[in-house]
């Protein structure tokens, strides 16, 4: 495998992956507030920003407070994604001071699609299927809820909104063992960039270690290559990161979601 310039990968990520892709999901709106993009209408508000927000001190505090107060008025939570190399470096402390709570950091990994693409190898009795119908999306949400022990019912509406806006912008896969979903995952294509985001990879505990997550990576990488995309992006959990590294992905930074939840 050829040496990879991780600095160049990071530069591509910063240039191309800071903002959401292509078509806006049904029911969602994008609003600009100075340097940041406010994503409104999903199950939770989201803030996306360039590497350098471009404001500091009291001005930054006011920017943060406006986002919190905007979503508080809607009775909704909001998340702000911060990468380890972002500026200003005190943004996390200022988010916490405004009432945001950090989640566990994820490792941002990039892979070269052509190197990762392969024929997916599945255990006996497991079938890989592409889905887009509402009933299948509800099953995916139930599967995610079961695995993570959290209410993931919003996943069905989120996926349906993306499919309804532009079905070519997302590929949703399920690995089925009989009438059970053993693993679920999807790809979000970023038109006009080199990137496909690999999302949602979730496997039932008793199916882990049997190659389903690897098969999902391989299948999605193959389609990325077929569609002309060069790079794969994952915000990886501690469980997923080692698998992705073995598949040739490269760490470029970490990302942390800072969550604000309205008082009850």
Model regions and ranges:
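N-terminal charged segments
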Residues: 1-70, 87, 154
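A conserved beta-turn-beta hairpin within the catalytic core of GNAT-like acetyltransferases
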Residues: 41-50, 103, 189-198, 208
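A conserved beta-strand-loop-helix scaffold within acyl/acetyltransferase catalytic domains
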Residues: 152-206
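Acyl-donor-binding surface of acyltransferase catalytic domains
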Residues: 58-136, 234, 240, 256-260
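Conserved beta-hairpin
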Residues: 29-34, 87-101, 169-185
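Conserved active-site tyrosine of GNAT-family acetyltransferases
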Residues: 95, 244, 249
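Conserved acetyl-CoA-binding loop-helix of GNAT-fold acetyltransferases
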Residues: 60-68, 199-205, 209-222, 226, ...
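Short amphipathic alpha-helix that is part of the acyltransferase structural core
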Residues: 1-19, 52, 57, 106-109, ...
């Amino acid at each position: 495998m050829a040496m990879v310039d991780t600095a160049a990968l990071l530069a591509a990520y910063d240039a191309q992956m800071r903002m959401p892709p292509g078509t806006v999901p049904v029911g969602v709106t994008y609003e600009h507030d100075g340097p940041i993009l406010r994503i409104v209408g999903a199950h939770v508000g989201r803030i996306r920003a360039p590497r350098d927000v471009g404001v500091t001190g009291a001005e930054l505090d006011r920017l943060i407070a406006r986002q919190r107060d905007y979503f508080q008025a809607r009775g909704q939570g909001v998340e702000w994604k911060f990468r380890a190399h972002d500026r200003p470096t005190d943004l996390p402390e200022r988010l916490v001071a405004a009432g945001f709570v950090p989640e566990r950091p994820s490792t941002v990994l990039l892979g070269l699609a052509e190197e990762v693409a392969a024929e997916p190898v599945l255990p006996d009795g497991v079938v890989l299927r592409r889905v887009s119908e509402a009933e299948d999306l509800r099953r995916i949400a139930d599967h995610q809820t079961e695995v993570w022990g959290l209410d993931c019912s919003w996943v069905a509406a989120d996926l349906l909104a993306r499919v309804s806006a532009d079905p070519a912008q997302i590929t949703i896969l399920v690995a089925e063992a009989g009438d059970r979903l053993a693993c679920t995952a999807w790809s979000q294509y970023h038109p006009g960039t080199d990137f496909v985001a690999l999302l949602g990879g979730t496997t039932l505990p008793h199916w882990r270690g049997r190659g389903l997550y690897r098969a999902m990576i391989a299948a999605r990488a193959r389609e990325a290559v077929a569609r002309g995309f060069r790079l794969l992006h994952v915000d990886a959990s501690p469980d997923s990161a080692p698998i992705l590294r073995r598949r040739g992905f490269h760490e470029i930074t970490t990302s942390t979601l800072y969550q604000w939840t309205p008082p009850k």
